[in-house]
Amino acid sequence: EWNEKTYPKNLLRESINISKRCIFSLDQLRYSYPNEFVPKGLTKTDYLHRLTTHGLKKRWPNGAPKEIYEQINHELALIKELSYESYFLTVYDIVDFAKKNNILCQGRGSAANSAVCYCLGITEVDPTHINILFERFISRERNEPPDIDVDFEHERREEIMQYIYRKYGRNRAALVAAVITYRPRSAIRDVGKALDIDFGQ
């Protein structure tokens, strides 16, 4: 039963004021990527720059072309501006673990447009051999976080997953499934393939 002693009017008024201040649009919600572990005394920006510079020297032992240096500086500046350093460091760490343990892996997709990903060993597409368009991968205007696809050899994927669980903890890492729906045409085509029926039939 309501009474003013239990629920003073001034407190009720204040709760209404608080609720008004809690109104927001879902458009305002932004995912904040967790900070990655970095060596003591370094910031995530410093560490990403150090790893990229080290990879640059490995990829081009006799020195990279001028445009590659410019491209890397452009990419690192945008990565810093959009606060994506931790994401790159996480993917680098996982790929580095795989390579040190002779687990086959390959970065693919729009990340191949990144000279930084090439220097970090995430992708294997030499940016001097293609006309890279970094903005296909990360763009200030698109305002979407980067998405680096990395494939690992099927037989040893479990080792990668266990490494991630050990490093980040099971409360901070999870498997995510992508579910697709078959359309009639593609379903019939795949059934035909499985039954070795020619598509023309």
Residue ranges and their predicted role:
Residues 1-201:
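Phosphodiester-processing cores and adjacent nucleic acid-binding clamps
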